[in-house]
Amino acid sequence: MTLQDEIKKRRTFAIISHPDAGKTTITEQLLYFGGEIREAGTVKGKKSGTFAKSDWMDIEKQRGISVTSSVMQFDYAGKRVNILDTPGHEDFSEDTYRTLMAVDAAVMVVDSAKGIEAQTKKLFEVVKHRNIPVFTFINKLDRDGREPLDLLEELEEVLGIASYPMNWPIGMGKSFEGLYDLHNKRLELYKGDERFASIEDGDQLFANNPFYEQVKEDIELLQEAGNDFSEQAILDGDLTPVFFGSALTNFGVQTFLDTFLEFAPEPHGHKTTEGNVIDPLAKDFSGFVFKIQANMDPRHRDRIAFVRIVSGEFERGMGVNLTRTGKGAKLSNVTQFMAESRENVTNAVAGDIIGVYDTGTYQVGDTLTVGKNKFEFEPLPTFTPELFMKVSAKNVMKQKSFHKGIEQLVQEGAIQLYKNYQTGEYMLGAVGQLQFEVFKHRMEGEYNAEVVMTPMGKKTVRWINSDDLDERMSSSRNILAKDRFDQPVFLFENDFALRWFADKYPDVKLEEKM
């Protein structure tokens, strides 16, 4: 098989949703169909003691939530599938947003009882901005939920995207009978306890059975007043195919997977900072780091840089250019993943996600190229923290572990580090409270370093050019600090303090992001 044929087999997508919509459950079922797990485990691990395959971090297993992005790969129906299971909790949106830069499509999981929720809307806006295809799975049909037509209407009104149902539910909750597959003209009957029946000549059964009268009326209405199916509109991100089903009972999931792989796009190109698009079928290797994760194997205190291959082929031992530093690096110890388990790989192609063992060489957003290519891909999104805490080691004898832990966890990008200019105290910045809790848990569990954390409340952060800096600018209304790149930054008590500073120093330029 040629390199181009291998690349065209790749399907790389993220699964997005509001917390508890069933995202991790559907991921489990997809892995089951891909032959990677023998059975899809019950995801509600915090009560049952069984854990999701994709939730590998200890705190994820304890709480039954996803707080990091997992990467999983399997072969199915002649395709190489790369799934990125993203954290649904809003505190981890920075990690999620970066992950969405590394995929070619998104699967949006919606709870049939709740419809479009806040986090789903936020994540959809990022996906929409990238113009990548969105496939919608409306979940939990085995429970009572909202009317299917209402859900489609909400999709279009709240998210502003046209929808096209690929199947249609017959009943819901206790009266759930199955799904009519509009795309394949097939009837799938639901019998509970993961027992199903599939009837190929669904049209004939529909026509002769009065039980399906309401469903027939809904379908006729959709055919008359609904949107037309267009594969191009799907690829352009203007039309979302909608699938109904129940991830927990594994009903409708395989039909979704089969149809998704039929219409999901091949790997696409990525823009450079100069506006050029790098073709995935180009011969030369290129890629970018979209995530760094410490302690995927706590026994070895390792760090993995996750790289999306944009073009060409990776071969073990190859040399690459790290554009940010202008230096070279050798990709010798490279892995691919099934959540926390991994295996060494000798080659991978555009569309694949690889993990490069990192000793501190890489940063999130780094571009890797070969030969004379020295371009950089467009920067990944960054977020300014709003909540702050002072942090110190509880035991002075554990300073080495404390500093090691802070260094590694900050480099992941899930939390940000600042150092008080005057006192040298460490301060952590986060988007949400859960990030602090996860930081504390991981410091104690992975680095054996207990920490003391003191809330500082909300702050307004602004960076300042070092040439403009005068330490006398620091006052009771602000804290002068350095970020982890030694750039000076002010943490203002509130917007009033920021305006006061701007009035007093009108010639000093303050930046929201560096």
Curated annotation (Swiss-Prot):
Protein name: Peptide chain release factor 3
Binding annotation for GTP: 17-24, 85-89, 139-142
Pfam families referenced in this protein's UniProt entry, alphabetically: EF-G_D2 (PF22042), GTP_EFTU (PF00009), RF3_C (PF16658)
Gene: prfC
One GO cellular component term noted in the UniProt record for this chain: cytosol
Principal location listed in the UniProt entry: cytoplasm
Family the entry assigns: Belongs to the TRAFAC class translation factor GTPase superfamily. Classic translation factor GTPase family. PrfC subfamily.
Alphabetical list of SUPFAM superfamilies matching this protein: EF-G C-terminal domain-like (SSF54980), P-loop containing nucleoside triphosphate hydrolases (SSF52540), Translation proteins (SSF50447)
Biological function: Increases the formation of ribosomal termination complexes and stimulates activities of RF-1 and RF-2. It binds guanine nucleotides and has strong preference for UGA stop codons. It may interact directly with the ribosome. The stimulation of RF-1 and RF-2 is significantly reduced by GTP and GDP, but not by GMP.
